[in-house]
Amino acid sequence: MMDRKQTAETLLTLSPAEVANLKEGINFFRNKTTGKEYILYKEKDHLKACKNLCKHQGGLFMKDIEDLDGRSVKCTKHNWKLDVSTMKYINPPGSFCQDELVIEMDENNGLSLVELNPPNPWDSDPRSPEELAFGEVQITYLTHACMDLKLGDKRMVFDPWLIGPAFARGWWLLHEPPSDWLERLCKADLIYISHMHSDHLSYPTLKQLSQRRPDIPIYVGDTERPVFWNLDQSGVGLTNINVVPFGIWQQVDKSLRFMILMDGVHPEMDTCIIVEYKGHKILNTVDCTRPNGGRLPEKVALMMSDFAGGASGFPMTFSGGKFTEEWKAQFIKAERRKLLNYKAQLVKDLQPRIYCPFAGYFVESHPSDKYIKETNTKNDPNQLNNLIRKNSDVVTWTPRPGAVLDLGRMLKDPTDSKGIVEPPEGTKIYKDSWDFGPYLEILNSAVRDEIFCHSSWIKEYFTWAGFKNYNLVVRMIETDEDFSPFPGGYDYLVDFLDLSFPKERPSREHPYEEIHSRVDVIRYVVKNGLLWDDLYIGFQTRLLRDPDIYHHLFWNHFQIKLPLTPPNWKSFLMHCD
């Protein structure tokens, strides 16, 4: 069978009026063009959807008159029952899970049901697992999301962030990487970088690597915004970046192949990967919220995923209204618990032989971010692993820098004392110094840039950014380290309805946001045309909004959709007043 590129297919659309008329519980729909049937389940603000097609023998479901809770449907062929609230079959129990469809809402509150096609691309050209020799497949944890995989005589590395900060100056490594990390990277046959966030695509790390091996093969997914969109400007001399389509096996040698999958159903930014060696699959979902639209291979040899939470400025950087310290603490506690339970349930459903929580080992270590560090609590990987073991037979691994998992040993006998070799006694596990100076000086250099001697940079920048025709007024305030107004800094309004820069807020009714930004970071971002993730995910802002509404189109534009080339400041300086 020929491999074909994975694409997203819209199965059903509902108008805003149809969405507003959805009743609590079960709703049946038919696509009049295709004749296909679908089920939507509504519980307050939460929606779930699936095909109206029984997994047993393809029968249609109808309302189950015996169901008093309004959650289950019954197949017209053999009376199989599906609980649509959980997407699990309850008669016979423990038989199947129904595949969920992805629900996408547009800005007008219309709805689309979307499915990836093919949904399970890893099933193309299936291979039976072969027995692994001891030492044949070894996984070494380096730090955060970086793993060093020995796969026969090949070496593959995931997401190398080994030095410097991520998100401007907001994230720093929690774990001390092994001292030979650069030698390990240089020996790799290939590197996978999941997405463009700087805790995965670390230009300081790659700069050191490129000085030794500029031609090292690096593989990324074919995302809407290229992963290496900023490579030329970064000054990092990598020459062998390979962009591969989603859902197609990439053959490395006769025993080793990998497949990159998208997050959700639209390949804007995030990806995940399946690595297969001699029929044994390693699934790395990285930071994906809904990897491959929620369809993932079951019973893989090893699964790894994020777990920690806290990768957002919400709610720590917000103030006003409900955003009291008590509210923030309760919200964070509830969100971390939800994430923990979701990850535990996902692992229980997928039943990998081994599970490893990673990609969450960062810390807000700069002294100016003490408040964020204390407020932004993270999930404990051991707590997640305990929860997984309590509810399943999955073997778990909480990694420490330099620890090595021998997959052949662990698959044969999970109790083998040599299956996981911990780092030697006395190995430094946690970082206690981060060399802030050089990285902060790079940011600080932007503060003194000639661009900012001319107030017309504001119009130049936001015209370049290209976001307009949206009823939102934003006040941008440059601040010092402590978020007090920066002496001589800029404080201005942007009206995105007509992209004007008024002296006062307009008289019409309008949503309003105040964004207080550390001057070194906002000016560095503006000068270099960088995405606002450095500001928001990096905790470099303090925000106030009235009303308390998340403006998705605004934030999505500045976090993902800015132009690929920076503003032409050279031309600006030649022509500005």
UniProtKB/Swiss-Prot annotation:
This is Cytidine monophosphate-N-acetylneuraminic acid hydroxylase. GO terms for molecular function: 2 iron, 2 sulfur cluster binding; CMP-N-acetylneuraminate monooxygenase activity; metal ion binding. Its EC number is 1.14.18.2. Residues 14-112 form the Rieske domain. Disruption phenotype: Mice do not synthesize N-glycolylneuraminic acid (Neu5Gc). Binds 1 [2Fe-2S] cluster per subunit. Pathway: Amino-sugar metabolism; N-acetylneuraminate metabolism. InterPro entries: CMP-Neu5Ac_hydroxylase_Rieske, Cnh, RibonucZ/Hydroxyglut_hydro, Rieske_2Fe-2S, Rieske_2Fe-2S_sf. It comes from Mus musculus.
